[in-house]
Amino acid sequence: MVRNCLSIVLAAGEGTRMKSPLPKVLHKIAGLPLVCHVIKQIELAGSLQLAVVVGSGAEDITKVVQSFTKNAMIFEQKERLGTAHAVLSARLALQEEVDDILIVFGDTPLIEHSSLVRIRAFLADGADVVVAGFYASDPTGYGRLIKKNGKLITIVEEKDASDEEKKVSLCNGGIMALNGKYALSLLNKIDNNNMQQEYYLTDVVSIASRQNLNIQVVEIPFDNVIGINNCFELFEADALWQKRKARDLMLSGVTILKPESVYFSYDTEIEPGVLIEPNVYFGPGVKIQSGAVIRAFSYLEGAVVGRDAQIGPYARLRFGTELERSVKVGNFCEIKQAKVGEFSKINHLSYIGDTEIGTNTNIGAGAITCNYDGFNKHKTVIDDDVFIGSNSVLVAPLSIGKGSYIASGSVITEDVPINSMVFGRARQVIKEDRAIKLRAHLSKNKRNK
């Protein structure tokens, strides 16, 4: 029997320690907001119902979440009265009949769907409350999971823990799952009789224990529950994410010569057999096919690189770039909104924008397309087997026919028929010995000043 699941993502925290006008959960690692990382893993874990509780920065968070997933129900926590109060802000969703309720914090971007699947499996096996825990060599600062006779009976925060309880190394990971049958009744029993006068989600455990419900602890890796509270922790989490991504790629058959110097985005796709040299940046939307070589100091975003292509060093591929098989893009080239056919070469010092290039075409050093007139972008179409000489300027809109040859230094403003040779430059004029007279004239003028 397939169990349905409601996941509640708590994203209402103010995040004051970030010291940023941007809501905490909208800060990014690998190019994706923290809360979207969490939602992605929740969906991969098979949870089809999603409630996101927002507070500070509600409008901005709502916009980002709804653009990322169409499944999200948004609920606002109007007062900051604790984590249980935040969960109950989604009361309308909780009132629906669901088997599993999964509660996750929106600032834990390193959670893996495999951990969430394991947590849900305990509910399927009969647990009523499941708490994610981890063992810490130094548990200072973390809530402790306190057991009695092998059973979890309560979660004690560090500030409230006795000396004996502080010796416990099993810590609260923050993620909790509830049997839908008991969820609302447990949450409704939580009170705010504490120093902070807040409603704590962790009190669910002691309430469930008193009711003799089945409470289980699932041990998950510490990095899965790392929360982000400041920009340094954001950096550390990003570094961990990058290390995971590089490891997964290398185990799949991608060669990365210096993985710590390469930056990947959340959706980077690289096939086995690709070679990546040091200091490469992959922005969102990049796909690299097998056999391609990405040389050092290249910057790619929104680009598809075909089989056996060679990129860089020092190349920039921008959004809308599609390179087919065995294309070469060399040093100090920028490609944007361009489709380049197989075996074509753009080897050095070129800007190619809003362009279609056919197969086996060569773009010489320093050749550029002029695609913008100050108001609108215009397209250049270059057919198969074309040679564009060095330092040529192609002024769009423009079409260059198959097999044509553009002489170096030309400025091309009109369409070129197939198999044409085009000169678009002024004729060279030679005046012998004129340089001697010119130098004498210039030298005299300089002395007179």
UniProtKB/Swiss-Prot annotation:
One GO CC annotation: membrane
Residues that hold UDP-N-acetyl-alpha-D-glucosamine according to the record: 10-13, 24, 77, 82-83, 143, 157, 172, 229, 318, 336, 351, 362
UniProt remark on cofactor binding: Binds 1 Mg(2+) ion per subunit.
GO terms for MF: glucosamine-1-phosphate N-acetyltransferase activity; magnesium ion binding; UDP-N-acetylglucosamine diphosphorylase activity
Gene Ontology BP, a term: regulation of cell shape
Cofactor (UniProt): Mg(2+)
InterPro entries: Bifunctional_GlmU, GlmU-like, GlmU_C_LbH, Hexapep, Hexapep_transf_CS, MobA-like_NTP_Trfase, Nucleotide-diphossugar_trans, Trimer_LpxA-like_sf
Active site: 348
Region annotation Pyrophosphorylase: where it falls in the sequence: 1-231
Record: residues binding acetyl-CoA: 365, 371-372, 390, 408, 425
Pathway the protein contributes to: Nucleotide-sugar biosynthesis; UDP-N-acetyl-alpha-D-glucosamine biosynthesis; N-acetyl-alpha-D-glucosamine 1-phosphate from alpha-D-glucosamine 6-phosphate (route II): step 2/2; Nucleotide-sugar biosynthesis; UDP-N-acetyl-alpha-D-glucosamine biosynthesis; UDP-N-acetyl-alpha-D-glucosamine from N-acetyl-alpha-D-glucosamine 1-phosphate: step 1/1; Bacterial outer membrane biogenesis; LPS lipid A biosynthesis
Residue numbers spanned by region Linker: 232-252
Covalent S-S links between cysteines: none
Described function: Catalyzes the last two sequential reactions in the de novo biosynthetic pathway for UDP-N-acetylglucosamine (UDP-GlcNAc). The C-terminal domain catalyzes the transfer of acetyl group from acetyl coenzyme A to glucosamine-1-phosphate (GlcN-1-P) to produce N-acetylglucosamine-1-phosphate (GlcNAc-1-P), which is converted into UDP-GlcNAc by the transfer of uridine 5-monophosphate (from uridine 5-triphosphate), a reaction catalyzed by the N-terminal domain.
Family named by the database record: In the N-terminal section; belongs to the N-acetylglucosamine-1-phosphate uridyltransferase family. In the C-terminal section; belongs to the transferase hexapeptide repeat family.
Protein name per Swiss-Prot or TrEMBL: Bifunctional protein GlmU
Organism taxonomic ancestry: Bacteria, Pseudomonadati, Pseudomonadota, Alphaproteobacteria, Hyphomicrobiales
